[in-house]
Curated annotation (Swiss-Prot):
SUPFAM superfamilies: L9 N-domain-like, Ribosomal protein L9 C-domain. Pfam families: Ribosomal_L9_C (PF03948), Ribosomal_L9_N (PF01281). One of its GO terms (molecular function) is structural constituent of ribosome. GO terms for cellular component: ribonucleoprotein complex; ribosome. Belongs to the bacterial ribosomal protein bL9 family. PROSITE patterns: RIBOSOMAL_L9. Coiled coil: none annotated. One of its GO terms (biological process) is translation. Binds to the 23S rRNA. This is Large ribosomal subunit protein bL9. InterPro entries: Ribosomal_bL9, Ribosomal_bL9/RNase_H1_N, Ribosomal_bL9_bac/chp, Ribosomal_bL9_C, Ribosomal_bL9_C_sf, Ribosomal_bL9_N, Ribosomal_bL9_N_sf. Keywords: Ribonucleoprotein, Ribosomal protein, RNA-binding, rRNA-binding. It comes from Mycolicibacterium vanbaalenii (strain DSM 7251 / JCM 13017 / BCRC 16820 / KCTC 9966 / NRRL B-24157 / PYR-1) (Mycobacterium vanbaalenii).
Length: 151
């Protein structure tokens, strides 16, 4: 099935890209969520408009992403106190991307979307220092050290 993306889809493309996907993936995932439209002549014109708008936004987006990167990497330490931790350093719950976003904001950093946070695994389940990657733009990624402590 030939589709034109209307939003960025990881491992597939950016808005305006014409992609060939399996029918089930297109019908059951991309189309219902509004991430793509069926490729027709009119849709191709619409994709060109989307691509032009994306190019204008990307310059502004790249500059903004670099500013956010400097703000995030300028934070001296981001500490997250977790109430439920065993003496061995293992958490009874887990630290999610939303918890990391709240910790960054509390430390004086910018307000981020939880989908931009790249955890080492799906969740953090131990205390100590963990390296976090924040994907701000396809070309800009900020690195951050999160210290999880029992509180």
């Amino acid at each position: 099935m030939k589709l034109i993306l209307t939003a960025e889809v990881e491992h597939l493309g950016v808005p305006g890209d014409a992609v060939e996907v399996k029918d089930g993936y297109g019908r059951n995932y991309l189309l219902p969520r509004g991430l793509a439209i069926v490729a027709t002549r009119g849709a191709q014109r619409q994709a060109d408009d989307i691509r032009r708008a994306q190019e204008l936004k990307s310059v502004k987006g790249l500059e903004h992403a670099n500013e956010l990167k400097q703000a995030i990497e300028g934070l001296e330490s981001v500490e997250l106190a977790v109430k439920t931790a065993a003496d061995s350093g293992k958490l009874f719950g887990s630290v999610t991307a939303a918890d990391v976003v709240a910790a960054i904001k509390k430390a004086g950093g910018p307000n981020l979307d939880k989908r931009t946070i790249g955890l080492p695994k799906a969740h953090i389940k131990t205390t100590g220092a963990h390296d976090i990657a924040v994907r701000l733009h396809p070309e800009v990624t900020a690195a951050l050290s999160l210290n999880v402590v029992a509180g």
